[in-house]
Amino acid sequence: MSSKIKTSGGIVIKEHKILFIRKNNRWDLPKGKLEKGINSRETAIIEISEETGLKAKHLSILKKLIPTYYHKKVDGVFIVKKTDWYLVEYNGSFDHPLVPDQSEGITDCRWFSFDELVLVLEESHERIRYLVEFFLNMPFYKKYKLKLKTY
C-alpha cells in the first residue's frame, strides 16, 4: 500500500543571499502541502510567508525548478512525497524581521550568502543540497549573479 503527498516550496533569494529555515536540527527550505483548490505556485508563496514571516506581496516567483522526491515507510504504508520547487525573489527589506513558524517546528529563519552555503548544506538533507546545487549551476543563476555584480 502506498500514499502520495504533494508539497510545494521555494528557494528564496535576495541579492546574494538564500533564505533557509531550521527544522529538526537541519537547514531546510520553506515548503508545505498543497490544499484543495490551491495550486503549486500559490502554495509555495503561502508556505514561504507562513513559515518565515515574510509578506507574500514581497515574494515573486521567477522560475519553476526541478521537483524532489522523498520516500519513507510509516506504519507499513509507503509514502512518496513530491515537492515542486520555485525560485522566488524577495523584494522587501532585509530589515523585515524573520518569524519562524514554531507551530511547524521551525526554530530559526536566516539569510545566508552564497559563500556560506557549503557549511549550511552540510546540515541539510541530500535533496536540499541537490536542489541548491542545481540552482547554482543554472544559466539563469549565472546571469542573475552577473547582474548583481554590476551594482
Question: What annotation goes with each model-predicted range?
Answer:
Residues L34-S124, Y151:
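Unchanged
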